[in-house]
A protein has these predicted regions:
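Active-site-proximal beta-strand/loop segments in catalytic clefts of secreted hydrolases
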Residues: 30-33, 88-90, 135-137
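Bacterial Sec-dependent N-terminal signal peptides
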Residues: 1-23
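Amphipathic beta-strand/beta-sheet edge segments enriched in Tyr/Trp
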Residues: 130-176, 315-325
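Short amphipathic beta-strand and strand-loop transition segments with alternating hydrophobic
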Residues: 135-139, 254-260, 308-310
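C-terminal/domain-edge helix-coil "capping" segments
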Residues: 21-44, 160-254, 292, 298, ...
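N-terminal segment of the mature soluble domain
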Residues: 43-126, 131, 235-303
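Extracytoplasmic/secreted cell-surface and envelope-processing proteins
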Residues: 37-40, 95-99, 141-144, 222-223
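Extracytoplasmic
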Residues: 22-24, 65, 69, 73, ...
Length: 325
């Protein structure tokens, strides 16, 4: 009986150690779009001729003292739970100081444009696995105050909601720290929230990340996606060949061909490995949509001698162009 008990204790220790050492997703805490709109911190962005409203991070962090405090408090809370954190403020500063900002790409020969919104660029640069969108509103209730909050965990690649919660803190003195009020509120649902994040990350390891891939043909390209090529005595359209490549390169062949025409192909729910080996230095690195797109582009270049361009839109989407870069 004693041996059985010792064996069970040993197994429990091994299991607990393995769980504690399991890799956790990298997190970046970002104010929710609703917060920016409600507080008037927005700006217009020209997305390929379409005017869209995007957050004005610079002005918000410069003029609003609460936003940096609340974002930092949430980041500290998650860091205390063992999650690696990407600092939003430092990432914004780094992007601002880059000499060559990639706000849009213009085709070298044809003048085609592929635009990336500021938030897409932020996600691609930060490479966090999960974005924590934090919306909060500090309200006065007579001589006291309370904080309304909405916390959502978003997969940075697929933009799907993983976990979340919303609520209102208890009424506290106006002198009480907003940090303390927020963290005490989050404690009430912490376990289920974090379990949702860890379960999602475990699913990614087993089934791969989810991304989207779009292929375009420029008018300058002599062939289109319906052009036929001979393989082992049979003829297949280029679209069918690309489709077969996706079956090879995805995790257990998991992807969906949403649409296909002579000039455009759109794949979604594309499951790619979390990690890949860099072909240049042989080292393991995180896989994103851009890296996956380059794999497909290299096949097009090698097999059909095409001019191919690869442009990321955030972490989870990539555009591949044939006939121009």
């Amino acid at each position: 009986m004693k041996k059985i008990f010792m064996l069970m204790a040993a197994l429990f220790t091994i299991s607990a150690t393995a769980f504690g050492q399991a890799k956790k997703p990298t997190i970046m805490v970002v104010p929710d779009d609703a917060w920016f709109v409600r507080n008037g911190y927005t700006q217009e962005f020209d997305n390929m001729g379409v005017k869209t409203i995007v957050p004005d991070f610079d002005r918000a962090f410069l003029e609003n003292a609460d936003v940096e405090v609340m974002v930092s408090a949430m980041a500290d809370f998650m860091a205390a739970e063992g999650f690696p954190i990407v600092s939003l403020k430092q990432e914004l500063k780094r992007l601002k100081n880059e000499s060559a900002e990639m706000a849009m790409m213009t085709g070298k020969n044809e003048g085609g444009m592929i635009a990336e919104t500021p938030i897409e660029r932020l996600r691609r640069s930060a490479k966090a696995d999960i974005i924590l969108n934090l919306d909060f509103n500090i309200k006065k209730v007579g001589p006291r105050k309370q904080i309304e909050f909405n916390l959502q965990a978003i997969d940075a690649y697929s933009s799907k909601i993983i976990s979340g919660n919303q609520g209102t803190s208890s009424e506290v003195s106006t002198t009480a720290s907003n940090i303390t009020v927020l963290q005490e509120s989050v404690l009430s649902f912490k376990d289920n929230f974090i379990r949702g994040l860890e379960n999602h990350f475990a699913d990614l390891f087993e089934n791969g990340r989810e991304i989207s891939v779009t292929l375009f043909r420029y008018d300058s390209c002599e062939i289109d996606f319906q052009e036929e090529f001979e393989i082992n005595g049979d003829y297949y359209e280029l679209a069918d060949i690309i489709d077969a490549w996706f079956a090879e390169e995805t995790v257990e062949g998991r992807y969906s061909l949403e649409s296909s025409s002579a000039n455009r192909m759109r794949f979604n729910q594309v499951r790619i490995p979390i990690y890949t080996v860099n072909p240049i230095n042989g080292k393991e690195q995180a896989m994103d949509a851009n890296a996956f797109g380059k794999r497909i582009a290299n096949k097009l270049k090698k097999n059909y001698n095409l001019v191919v361009g690869v442009t990321p839109k955030g972490l989870g989407e990539v555009w591949i162009t044939i006939g121009d870069k």
